[in-house]
A protein has these predicted regions:
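Short hydrophobic beta-strand that contains or immediately precedes a catalytic carboxylate
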Residues: 87-88, 112-113, 123
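Right-handed parallel beta-helix
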Residues: 108-110, 115, 129-139, 152-163, ...
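Beta-strand-enriched, solvent-exposed domains that form extended recognition/catalytic surfaces
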Residues: 1-80
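Extracellular beta-strand-rich solenoid/capping regions of secreted or surface-exposed proteins
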Residues: 4, 46-48, 93-110, 118-134, ...
């Protein structure tokens, strides 16, 4: 499977070329969107007028498809010179924490991944509060994507996580986690999507998960996390 993403407003025409064989038929899912592509030779064309997450499938093949993530344009981009902002520009970034391969996030911090930013490491929120992780950048093959432990008020919005070896997002004994417009792919054993252990007040909204283990799993006590789980909602996903 392959993936493309872009930001837009208004209307956009999407032109797709199949470059590895004859294009006999194509479908754009979810079918509920009612998108009927025009086919011309090995090209297909369709129009979008709002942000969507789509699967373009060729010749009835659901596995070797093209994921199209049409994102809204981000408004109010954080100031990269703000001391409370961790700003990752387009390019490849590796953490200085070589042993854990993690970017550690303090309280009252906004993490912004610019489009084209690729982080080769995990993001860790441990015993913090009031954290935002935003942008249309990517985490690439981290040991774990985003870890939220013993924390409060964490927002994750817009990023893509590709081939995390374990959880894309894990929450442990935390409160007030919101996840929006997240895209996640994984292929290994134990590579869950979103797992929550003893968490409360969690909102999962408008996410796309193609994971090789559980897409979403909810636990009470597990490992060093204690307490019940409550008020966890999954919307538009």
């Amino acid at each position: 499977a392959t993936m493309v993403q872009f930001d837009f407003s208004g209307k956009v025409e999407v032109l797709v070329q199949k470059n590895n064989g004859e294009l006999r038929s194509a479908v754009v899912r979810p079918l509920s969107k009612g998108i009927q592509p025009e086919i011309d030779g090995n090209f297909l064309l369709f129009t979008l007028d709002k942000p969507q997450k789509l699967s373009v499938e060729f010749n009835g093949d659901r596995l070797n498809n093209l994921h199209v993530f049409a994102n809204p344009i981000i408004e109010n981009v954080p100031d990269k010179n703000d001391p409370n902002v961790m700003y990752f520009e387009s390019g490849i970034h590796e953490p200085t924490d070589v042993a854990g391969k993690c970017f550690r996030i303090p309280s009252n911090t906004t993490v912004y991944l610019e489009g084209g930013a690729v982080l080769k490491g995990c993001l860790t929120c441990d015993s913090v509060e009031n954290v935002k992780i935003l942008g249309h950048g990517m985490l690439l093959e981290p040991q774990q994507g985003i870890s939220v432990a013993y924390s409060k008020n964490v927002l994750i919005d817009g990023i893509t996580v590709v081939n995390s070896r374990h959880y894309t997002v894990s929450g442990g004994q935390s409160q007030g986690i919101t996840i929006k417009n997240l895209k996640s792919f994984s292929y290994q054993g134990w590579s869950d999507g979103l797992d929550f252990m003893s968490c409360s007040d969690v909102v999962i909204d408008d996410v796309f998960l193609r994971n090789s283990d559980d897409c979403i799993a909810i636990y009470t006590h597990r490992w060093n996390y204690y307490g019940d789980s409550r008020n966890i909602r999954v919307l538009n996903s």
